[in-house]
Amino acid sequence: MIELAAIHHQPFNSDAYSYNGRTLHIKIRTKKDDAEHVAWFGAILTNTPAHMESERAYVAKIGRNKQPMITGLPKCGLHSGSAIRIYLTALMIETLFTEAMVHVRFRYRQTHVLNFRLFMRQTRLMHRLGQINRLVSNFSGAFRAGGKICSGKPLPWGRKDPEAHDFFGGHLQGIMTSWTIWKTWGEAGIYLTPIFAAPSNHKYDTLDYCSIDPHFGDEELFRTVVSRIHERGMKIMLDAVFNHIGTSQEWQDVVKNGETSRYKDWFIFILSLLKKAAMIHLRLVPRCRSSIAGTRKFRLICLILRCTGSANLISTAGVWMWQMKLIMRFGRNSGKPSPEKPDIFILGEIWHQADPWLRGDEFHIGHELPVHRTDDSLFFRRIDFSSQIASRINSQKMSGMKQVKEVMLNLLDSHERILTRCGGDQRKGARLFWHSCLLRQGRIYYPRKSGFTAAMIHCAGSAWFGKRKNRIKRCLAFMKPLIALRKQENDVLTYGALEWKLVDDQNDFVSFSRTHEGKELIYFFHQGREVRRVRLRDLKIASDKRIYDAWTEEALHDDDVVDIQPGDFSFLGRSKFC
């Protein structure tokens, strides 16, 4: 008996949509183990749909964990005037495509009927952004100085723990003197944290969106940097922080008068923190409250600046992408490209699920924090079982369109921040590897000179002393091949199907694979306390395929055994013999 209340399918949205104009993706959610088999039929629609004839194709289950089972239809032909029927054991789902719309009817033993309608038009098709694959973030103020200091008096390296208004001399010229770093890392683009005029080092309290901060250089130097980046086949992305108001007159009135200020409702802040000396830190840079008319006016001014002065700067300099911080706090259409540069890509930062914002063409791509938190709960906080993590990843994977997930720029984090959060335990590098092999595009945050830890404040981090150089070198030695591997296996990691091989809660062991065009990558992550032995014979390798260690490219054999240490990972490849 199928539980009807557990059946979920919403035409279009992320349950039924066109992937590329030739392929239709359909997803159906049922209660765990309710549907043993799923099959679909496709045929040209006639006046007698009951006479549909077609070859039957079976669909594999995508997720099967403690959460309700998710079953998907990976591919089927999409033609105007065609019809598709999907069967789940006793449950029949009938989808009829006509010239104008799609009728979807759920039937249970021909007695229970749910009706849906869906318009599938060419203008509704969403195409993925093919140019995005590797992006490295850069915190310019503490990255590297490249000769003469542009402005201000920088602090000597390691003199003190940095505060919001401390400056270490990093500027745009330093980016041009670091080409060997970018070449070694093999990145496709550089994302600069805010570089517009602001008093702090993090620049989130922007004063002028139309000029480069003197700490970093000037407009001429910026154009030169962008030009040199383009010469090396790379792209550049800027950070827009219109959601913060900086040190404006209205905010200063709140700081001075507190509850009695006429502007106190303009901002989101904790009043008690204003009385503390730390109020200059980023966490206390106010965020605008979108429901207040005054802040809407301020945001309008920001958008005018974006469409005039800032847009002129990025269009003439050749900037490729602009990230909009906390885009969900803005109104609709605020993320659309300006008329001055319609070909610029807009990346939206979302603190929750980003897919709904992409469906409405608010911006081109996005990154969502729930993915980051899911990874952390497995490797750092250790508050969830492996099966819960797998289920959550399935839900994230199935929540949106595949072409959207393929270009989601979720933050991969920096090797320095990872070491800080895990207390210096370098085995936590598995966290970086885990993130890079799932369905998303990695964006590495490399904000500081080698030797900075990543303190969780939005100004520069603290400096490492003693053995910091050796630790950083070991981290870099891990990150470089990781980036190279992501570049080499980009097709598999972008388009490949995800299949969970083993999710063992008792021993904290997870294994899954990514498969694309005959090539399979198999991953093993072990967070338990004992050494885990993996016998390759248990993988049931076909005789016409070879297996190898994908990290070292060393050939392996059917009778080999791979030992995975606690907190470590292993990575195997399987493909046909050349």
UniProtKB/Swiss-Prot annotation:
<comment type="function">
    <text>Converts starch into maltose. In contrary to other maltogenic alpha-amylases BlmA cannot hydrolyze 1,4-alpha-glucosidic linkage next to 1,6-alpha-glucosidic linkages.</text>
</comment>
<dbReference type="Pfam" id="PF00128">
    <property type="entry name" value="Alpha-amylase"/>
</dbReference>
<dbReference type="Pfam" id="PF02903">
    <property type="entry name" value="Alpha-amylase_N"/>
</dbReference>
<dbReference type="InterPro" id="IPR004185">
    <property type="entry name" value="Glyco_hydro_13_lg-like_dom"/>
</dbReference>
<dbReference type="InterPro" id="IPR017853">
    <property type="entry name" value="Glycoside_hydrolase_SF"/>
</dbReference>
<keyword id="KW-0326">Glycosidase</keyword>
<dbReference type="GO" id="GO:0005975">
    <property type="term" value="P:carbohydrate metabolic process"/>
</dbReference>
<keyword id="KW-0378">Hydrolase</keyword>
<keyword id="KW-0119">Carbohydrate metabolism</keyword>
<dbReference type="InterPro" id="IPR013783">
    <property type="entry name" value="Ig-like_fold"/>
</dbReference>
<protein>
    <recommendedName>
        <fullName>Maltogenic alpha-amylase</fullName>
        <ecNumber>3.2.1.133</ecNumber>
    </recommendedName>
</protein>
<dbReference type="GO" id="GO:0043897">
    <property type="term" value="F:glucan 1,4-alpha-maltohydrolase activity"/>
</dbReference>
<dbReference type="InterPro" id="IPR014756">
    <property type="entry name" value="Ig_E-set"/>
</dbReference>
<comment type="similarity">
    <text>Belongs to the glycosyl hydrolase 13 family.</text>
</comment>
<dbReference type="InterPro" id="IPR006047">
    <property type="entry name" value="Glyco_hydro_13_cat_dom"/>
</dbReference>
